[in-house]
Each structure stands twice: as C-alpha cells, then as structure tokens.
Amino acid sequence: VTPTRPGRPVPTLTSPQTLRHARILGLGGYRPERVVTNEEICRYIDSSDEWIQQRSGIVTRRFARPDETVVDMAEAASRQAIDRAGIDPGQIGAVIMATVTHPYQTPAAAPELGHRLGIPDPAAFDISAACAGYCHGISLANDMVRAGTVDHVLVVGVEKLSDFTDKHDRGSAFIFGDGAGAAVVGVSDTPGIGPTLWGSLGDKTDVITQREPWTELRPAMEDPSHHGEIAWPSFVMQGQTVFRWAVFSMAQVAIDTVAAARITTEDLDAFVPHQANMRITDA
C-alpha cells in the first residue's frame, strides 16, 4: 500500500506474476456440403473452367446452405477442435470469432457460439480483419494465455462469403467460398506459438472492399423511386493489384517473422500461407 497523504492509503493493483507459455491444443474445420464447380460459376460470368484454373488454381469451392449461418459453421468446427484438444467446454475462458460476414452489426457472433457450446459466461468478441482475422485471433489468444488472463481460448475463423459475392463480377466471383476453422489455445510447458508481426496498409483500403456502406441501402428501402440505384454491398477487389501486393508483401513478412523467431527457413518443417489462390502461393 502506498500512502498519498496521511490517513488516505491507495491500494496497489495486482496482476498475474508469471508469464506462461501457450500452444494450439486442438484444431477443427468445417466445409459446407455443397460443392460449386467452375462451370457453375461461369453461368454468370464470361469465363471458363480452364481460364479460372489457369489464373487461380481453383477447381471447386464450397457454399453454405441459405439457412446455414456463420455461427452454425463455427459451431461444427469448434466442437471438433475442443474434442481434439481433450478438454471440456467449461474450461474455455474466452471465445474469439474472426469474421466479416456475420450479418448483424450487433450482437457479435462469439457470445452465441459460446452459448451453443455450453461455455459458461466466457469473454466473447468478434474481430473484423478479413483474411488476417484468424491470425489476429491466434495472436490475441496467445497473449491472453501467456498473461494468465485465461487458461484456454477458442479461436474461430469463419466466413460465408457467398452472401457477399457478386456472382456477375468476373474479377471476384470465382475466388470466394464458405467455411470455418477453429483452434483451442491453452497453457503449455514450452513455447508453442512464435512471435507475431502486426501491420496494416491503410492506403490500400480500396483494393479489397465492400461495394457500398450499409447506410446507402436505407434510401432505396424507404423510397421506391431509388430502387435499382443502390447495389447490394458485395465485396469487390482489384485483382492485379492484390496479386502484386500479396506476392511481394507476404514473402517479406514471412522472412521477417522467421527472423523474429530467431530461426532460419531451414528449420521449418512446413509453410502454410494464406489460401488466396495457387498463383499467389506459387509465386
């Protein structure tokens, strides 16, 4: 206790004293049943299966059912991850959901997921970081476990991009699909998650973006004379710009991350890049 003036002591705040290690204890995944071929995509765009495979390496993708939500997909992936981690859902102290396709501004999807899984009153929140969201979630979970805030964190990356894809847009219609991946991060005797390199490029917000803000839909809904003037706020991107950006940036970030971990590329057993498309990965 530190006195500030006679008769008025101020209590000292306490916090966890030891920095622990963390690792991924279990992984889970979910892909919807419906397989969508390039031929089906080409019904709406001027393209071909051969062109799509040549440009992206993509042969098929999965689309969720119309009544299948991001929480439904996240639940399936999470149950698998929790089972593989060998823990009870009640041991999970926090749920992090990475998604940009939960259709509600509020409430977040994470609390509903925690409730479905039988997790009693966890800290639960969504993060909106698009392609980087899952990695952001893993890093946050790692920090939470190491700091002693919680012992186990459920991290889920899930998207239902079929709801926000313009099937008539030749530049993006064949790129996106639906699915979920989950991980349980928990306490470990040895380090299991390496350093994270954070960053963003705010000057490139127009490269991959939502076509219209949600607020632009209100005039069209309230005034019939505006019908047809406002497009559904689907995701669009500048393909060539994204390709160049991803190829050069991802390679440098990988090099910098390896250096931050104080290892070399020869020490790596596997390299798992973001699954954008085969051309980017190969480049």
Where do the language-model regions lie?
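Condensing-enzyme catalytic core mediating Claisen C-C bond formation in acyl metabolism
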Residues: 2-66, 169-248, 252
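Short glycine-aspartate micro-motif
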Residues: 21-24, 94-96, 151-155
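Buried hydrophobic positions in well-ordered alpha/beta secondary-structure cores of metabolic enzymes
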Residues: 24-26, 52, 81, 92-95, ...
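Acidic, glycine-rich active-site loops and adjacent beta-strand->loop/helix elements
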Residues: 30, 98-103, 129-134, 157-162, ...
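Conserved catalytic cysteine-centered active-site region
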Residues: 51-72, 100-153, 283
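Phosphate/pyrophosphate-binding loops at sites that engage ATP/ADP/AMP, CoA/4′-phosphopantetheine
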Residues: 77-93, 252-269
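Glycine-rich phosphate-binding loops at beta-strand->alpha-helix junctions
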Residues: 95-104, 268-283
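Flexible, glycine-rich active-site loops centered on histidine and acidic residues
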Residues: 146-180
